[in-house]
Amino acid sequence: DVIKMLYRKVESELSPRERLVLKMRYGLYNEEEYTQREIAKHLGISRSYVSRIEKSAIEKLREYF
């Protein structure tokens, strides 16, 4: 199942921060969906840094699909 494989890759290939950003951004694991600005405020980092983390995480996952 592709969804199960994706979740396994999220857990095994991404850093804790990358996982958190994707979980918050896309509402994974029953999380609420947040904007990049909201995530940045929650983590105490800039919105542009959240964007870079998100992009990096998606690129890592793209290698497998």
Positions of PLM-derived features:
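Transcription-machinery-associated regions
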Residues: 1-65
